[in-house]
UniProtKB/Swiss-Prot annotation:
Pfam families found in the cross-reference section: Homeodomain (PF00046), HoxA13_N (PF12284)
Intracellular or extracellular location(s): Nucleus
InterPro entries: AP_axis_regulatory_Homeobox, HD, Homeobox_CS, Homeodomain-like_sf, HoxA13_N
Source species of the chain: Takifugu rubripes
Annotated protein name in UniProt: Homeobox protein Hox-A13a
Length: 302
């Protein structure tokens, strides 16, 4: 026969309840339950607790052999068998009626424990109370869910932080390297674990030279549309503007007359061909270099 004991927490209500299985050994049970003291415990409290099962929900289940006592020298008061247990000894009770029976009941509150003789397990002990676990098993269960119990270990690896992203040096001018370092700080976006976080753009160092090339091409296009007089854009190379046939004919005629142009001729040709004086000067320089290359090539052949 198994005797179950229910104790409420010491800081709420120091009450004790004894539940007996009316199997014919009530005298033997009263002898085995000697030495349990519960403060202001009366004989009729057992019936009161059985009549209000809602008060038993936050309590803790203890076995008859591992019950902490709050006092030693107080006189022993025994509880008579409960009427509810006598009338319905074989009735089925809902699970959790005697508190949580999952964890072991070997608990100590710095008080003396008086053990009684071992009793064979009965139907109530096997069905409503699990005392097979030990204190070591209790601590191991607590360690399993100690930290982050709601985050499962999925197949994804930890996402690298900003310091883990390798920096690939690129071959560029000193001025361009300064701009690339600033762009890498601004365009970086850390990875997030949001549902749409994996689809967001991630910084890649290999994409920076391509972005710089696109920026240069846009600047060169802007300078080509502004005209020849605007010299504010010095970064990109201007687009080459070919000369017309009328302009080339006038320039070739002056070059045949004199390879080196004077200031008066330059102003006159600039007014006739609608070109700047600088363009006329550059054309004469390039024409002399071209003729020199042709002469050197003929000398090497001959």
């Amino acid at each position: 026969m198994t005797t179950s004991l229910l104790l409420r927490p010491r800081w709420v209500d120091p009450s004790v309840m004894f539940l007996y299985d009316n199997g014919g050994g009530s005298d033997e049970v009263s002898k085995n339950m000697e030495g349990f003291a519960g403060g202001n415990f009366a004989a009729n409290q057992c019936r009161n607790l059985m009549g209000h099962p809602a008060s038993l929900a936050p309590s803790t289940a203890y076995s008859s052999c591992d019950v902490p006592t709050s006092a030693i020298g107080e006189p022993v008061k025994q509880c008579s068998p409960c009427s509810a247990a006598q009338n319905s000894s074989s009735a089925s009770l809902p699970y959790g009626y005697f508190g949580s029976g999952y964890y072991p009941c070997r608990m100590s509150h710095h008080s003396s424990i008086k053990s009684c003789s071992a009793q064979p397990p009965s139907a109530y002990g096997e069905k409503y109370m699990d005392t097979s676990a030990t204190s070591d098993d209790f601590t191991s269960r607590a360690k399993e869910f100690a930290f982050y119990p709601t985050y499962p270990s999925g197949p994804y690896q930890p996402v690298p932080s900003y310091l883990d992203v390798p920096v690939v040096p690129t071959i560029s001018a000193p001025s361009e390297a300064r701009h690339e370092s600033l762009l890498s700080m601004e365009s970086y976006q850390p990875w997030t674990l949001a549902p749409n976080g994996w689809n967001s753009q991630v910084y890649c160092a290999k994409e920076q030279p391509q972005a710089g090339h696109m920026w240069k091409s846009s600047v060169s296009d802007a300078t080509s549309h502004t005209g020849g007089d605007s010299g504010s854009y010095r970064r990109g190379r201007k687009k080459r503007v070919p000369y017309t046939k009328v302009q080339l004919k006038e320039l070739e005629r002056e070059y045949a007359a004199n390879k080196f142009i004077t200031k008066d001729k330059r102003r006159r040709i600039s007014a006739q061909t609608n070109l700047s004086e600088r363009q006329v000067t550059i054309w004469f320089q390039n024409r002399r270099v071209k003729e020199k290359k042709v002469v050197n090539k003929l000398k090497t052949i001959s």
